[in-house]
Amino acid sequence: TYVFWGGREGTETDLSKNAADAIKRNREAMNFLCEYVLDQGYDLKFALEAKPNEPRGDIYNPTTGHMLAFIETLDHPEMVGVNPEVAHEHMAGINFMHGVAQAWEAGKLFHIDLNDQYPGRYDQDLRFGSRDIKAAFYLVKFLEDVGYEGMRHFDAHAYRTEDYEGVKDFARGCISTYLVLKEKAAQFNADKEIQALLAEINADDGSMSQYFGAYSADKARALKEQPFDRSEISSKGLQYERLDQLTID
């Protein structure tokens, strides 16, 4: 898998170029590259990495969601996926795990960059898990639960204060954090109290199952006639506070 980060593909003033034409040029380039790979008989795929800004003032296709939509317009979308990066999505204030889940569900999670980041700031590339350990846990748990087998790439760097030994501490820290969170994810999945609570939270009485699946006019008609007691529904707490605290505990 070859990763593309289009850090050059952006603008500081939207009067400098037509944004739609810029997307078309990106599409033409990716189509050309895919055809070249096929013509040469290479066993190669591409992963597109999104970033909202830096070094350009604004970068086209700034998030993983934008990239997923763009990929579906290509001539060979099966050859192109995404490489989500923690820091880049957090720069845009987005829930990273949700973007990863969307990419995975679409069959487009070809690669992933792990680091950490304060939201809304320049690209910091902090040690994985060093800022938001809970978000890092959610991510690791998702990757392990779905059986992701691709690369786990630590696109990060040590604090500017570190010497050579500090850089080695940083590298070991990235790997250690992932492995610790992997172990904690297994512990979460095996915890009887947590699993009992999840079963209660997600319990389904089957009352809506008749509406599942494909559309039909009969289903739509019945759904519009389905009574809902809003007071009864809203009176039952969902116990998310307890679940969240058990996760921390």
Predicted features by range, described:
Residues 1-81, 203-213, 230-249:
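Active-site acidic/histidine proton-transfer and metal-coordination neighborhood
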Residues 3-6, 48-52, 82-88, 113-116, ...:
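A cross-domain feature marking catalytic cores of carbohydrate-active enzymes
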Residues 8, 25-27, 56, 121, ...:
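Arginine residue identity/basic-tract feature
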Residues 17-20, 57-68, 78-81, 88-149, ...:
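Gly/Pro-rich active-site loop or hairpin
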Residues 26-31, 136-137, 175:
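Short, hydrophobic/amphipathic alpha-helical packing segments
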Residues 146, 152, 209-213:
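Short non-domain terminal segments
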Residues 164-249:
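C-terminal extensions of enzymes
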